[in-house]
């Protein structure tokens, strides 16, 4: 057997729709004899094939070719052992019919599967199944397929549906039929309803699996060796269940509950095969390794004891205790207390903690700590401290919290005391102070690597407290006795390097807590010292700013960077302010000297910009010499310059050159005045438009001394000044009020606006304009009259053409046109107010009527009457009458569209022949038919209640309404039939008439 791939699926034509029927497919094998014994025609027809032989001379002879009606695929060269269904589904797996038949014999295939339902739905071919688009029926293709039916029509029943599982055929479907219920009611034992999966488990197995919490998929997998749990003995035998890989991973990932204080010997005894491990590391259980797979890297889990929620202990205390060795002088009592806290796992109250700490630590002990101990630097311990002190390591979180608190308190107090208090103050402190710096301060002060002085205790012979910042030499720290600045070298000599114990004890913190009250009192005094007004600070730091050499020497000696505090910054700002004031005073004095002594001859206006520039240079140079920023100083002296420099006025002498005059005008925010033809305009120099327009300058007028600068601006249109306004001067009153300068007053006095010559010229121009406008108006009126006359002529000629062409079609109307033109010309020569009538048209029309041959009497009579009425009623209107108004009555003339059309111009030729009549005199008298009456429903005659028949009286209301509707419908049908018969008769008459023509 060989298949033929179809090029494309053919459409469902009529022949293909017939092949849906099994009997039709079987008939194709009988019409043309099937050449083979096997496979039989019956089997081929059931599979969906119909006989389609190919016997053409050009191609091969395929006498055993068959084609599927559903997928249109052809097969030929059949053999005896071929199975048609198997060949069909193998070579055309997408065929719905083959898929349905193959699934019928498969017990593992669910009949109600979605794929089978879709294939069954495709068998109900459109335009073949009669209930496709019938909403009143419940037999749509999707519903039939979901009920288990396929379409299998027969010769007797075209709506037959067939079930392949129970071989039932149902046809003659009604609107109320439900296919699913009908199928189940007739064949309840059909496989479509009773199918069960043979591979499914029984209910007892499912219930067992649900109670045992085992996945059904896990039972099908092979058993594997599971890791032994550490709590159970390895000698015992356990039942092993095979879990899925995900469950294996979850089991291996479970944390094992192990105690921190377990005995390692017991573990070794219980697990002899495993390598010995440390007690802190857990025992790792791994699954057996599979072949050809690399082992995954698993991180060992670290198990920690469970701690109370409200404990002050840190998570890493175990690591610290294990890694850091204890010092020699630690007692066993502290270890017992610490172990007790870990084992009992109960948080201690605050009172209990204080009691234990007082019991452990003696009150007379004192501890010296350094930052080098915190950062990891080893220091030599004092033997006396080791012998006296005996305590355990407190929890780390308590140490850090207390250290941070004390650092914040000490750093604040020491910063305030170092900025205000002097070194010479004597305070008798019997106790030593702790000074520990934060990591941020350590980063700033790490430059001196030789000393490693990140934080230390400072002890003098007199036991005076010194600042906790040894590396920073602040400028405000001065010696009270000498009044000079303490250099870093001298300060370095005072530092005492002491040996401290490696660990900070609670004694230090107890001493610090006792001293808080005294330090807070000192802090309040320091804050009051900080609230000193600025004038006192000026006096305080005046000596520091004057002694430059001392500052330089002190900074050169110290290799460490100078740290500037807030008070030092305020001192620098005060010094800047004083320098600027001194410089400004000096510059003012220099300006006065220059203006009085050197430049007495020159005017003041020339000297102002030069002195301002010099003053700026002096101030900038003075600030740069100090080595300070010029940004702040510029903002200060700019305002002072603006104050003492006088703004230039408009009254400037002619001696100034052009460049200086422009500079002065740009700097000063003054009003520039431009006087053009006696019209004043004000402008602001700061606007960008005025700056662009101010470039065009008349140097001649500037030298003449009338104005400062005559700027020609074309921004605003200049108002036209009438001569009467010039005389009265009212145009000046209408302008906006402003202060007029002396120069402007001079210009108004010297201007020639109010001179008698200019007034006479303006009067002459006004008279000339009046004469010109009057001439133009006269010309316009004359042109308007001529246009009106021409339009009237055109309309008259159109009327003549239409009327006379209908009356006398054989002659041209030239005389009438010329006569009308002559008449209109004579009218145009006369005055426009007179009204004239055209009398020559009467003569022309009378002559033409007498000589008209072969014209109808009706048309000639109509033309006479119309021409007389039209000509006598024409009155030429006056020239000043608008053209939009009609000058004759259009309703009288039947030729309104012709008169107003643009096709009949005065010189266009007119038809000479008369049009033939559309209908001859012998035409049959057609009756007018109104077809709209057929569409209207007939109105029944009102029935009187007295004339009701006996039948109607016996009826109910509903029956009587139905009876009346039927009666009206019958009458309407009769009326329609009568009209149809009449139309048919008239149609026959029309046909006979046309044939006779």
UniProtKB/Swiss-Prot annotation:
Binding residues for Zn(2+): 163, 166, 183, 190
Basic and acidic residues bias (residue ranges): 426-451, 773-782
GO MF: metal ion binding
Statement: the UniProt record of this protein carries the keyword Transferase: no
Pfam families named among the record's database cross-references: BIR
Ranges: BIR repeats: 25-99, 120-194
Major subcellular site: nucleus
Keywords of the record: Cell cycle, Cell division, Centromere, Chromosome, Cytoplasm, Cytoskeleton, Metal-binding, Mitosis, Nucleus, Phosphoprotein, Repeat, Zinc
Comp. bias (Polar residues): 240-252, 370-392, 463-476, 485-512, 756-772, 817-830
PROSITE patterns, alphabetized: BIR_REPEAT_2
Regions of compositional bias (Basic residues) in chain numbering: 288-299
Subcellular location: Nucleus; Cytoplasm, Cytoskeleton, Spindle; Chromosome, Centromere
GO cellular component assignments: chromatin; chromosome passenger complex; cytoplasm; kinetochore; meiotic spindle midzone; mitotic spindle; mitotic spindle midzone; nucleus
Compositional bias (Low complexity): 408-423
Superkingdom of this protein's organism: Eukaryota
Biased composition range(s): Acidic residues: 311-320
PTM summary: Phosphorylated by ark1.
Location of the region described as Disordered in the Swiss-Prot/TrEMBL record: 217-329, 370-527, 682-701, 755-782, 817-838
A Gene Ontology BP annotation from the UniProt entry: mitotic sister chromatid segregation
Cited function: Component of the chromosomal passenger complex (CPC), a complex that acts as a key regulator of chromosome segregation and cytokinesis. Has a role in chromosome segregation by recruiting condensin and ark1 kinase to appropriate sites as the cell progresses through mitosis. Ark1 activity depends upon bir1 function and phosphorylation. Ark1 with bir1 function is required for full-scale association with kinetochores and formation of a complex with mad3.
Quaternary state and interactors: Component of the CPC complex at least composed of ark1, bir1 and pic1. Interacts with the mitotic checkpoint complex (MCC) subunit mad3.
Protein name: Chromosomal passenger complex protein bir1
Taxonomy of the source species: Eukaryota, Fungi, Dikarya, Ascomycota, Taphrinomycotina
